[in-house]
């Protein structure tokens, strides 16, 4: 019987199959890499805020405990963003006329909360209870990183499931 295809066709077919396999594996690797990158997880990305609140100054410099501002962290699933009145506990006496704190004073006067940009944002299907973790002795820096060294807040961990499993295994 006569040969229909040239002998090099077998080589070409093998190269095509291995090339397609290499391309599929490469695309899967690329997708997995992008999914874990700071572009998706927003890890180590500083978020713009309505005013420059420095955890470095308040926690690191002045030694204010996280629970002074985030009062519900031990009893509620959510740590919460402090009310403007908490800021004014100190700033009605200290830096009370500072131009930087004008939005805080205006917020208190108008009884309108400051619209902070959320830094740590879990996926909608994930449930995280701050109070359980705090009562079990998990420190704030375990998840939030070195907050006492952050002039502006950023997300120190990826907060993806594989990161959580690092402790929960």
Residue ranges and their predicted role:
Residues 1-52, 56-60, 64, 73-82:
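N-terminal export/targeting leaders of redox proteins
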Residues 2-6, 31, 94-126:
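Primarily the internal scaffold of c-type cytochrome electron-transfer domains
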Residues 7, 14, 36, 47, ...:
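Arginine residue identity/basic-tract feature
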Residues 18-23, 34-38, 55-57, 93-99, ...:
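A generic short-segment signal for beta-strand/edge and adjacent turn/coil regions
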Residues 29-33, 45-47, 66-68, 104-108, ...:
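A short linear-motif detector with a strong N-terminal bias
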Residues 47-102, 129-169:
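Sequence context surrounding c-type heme c attachment/ligation sites in exported
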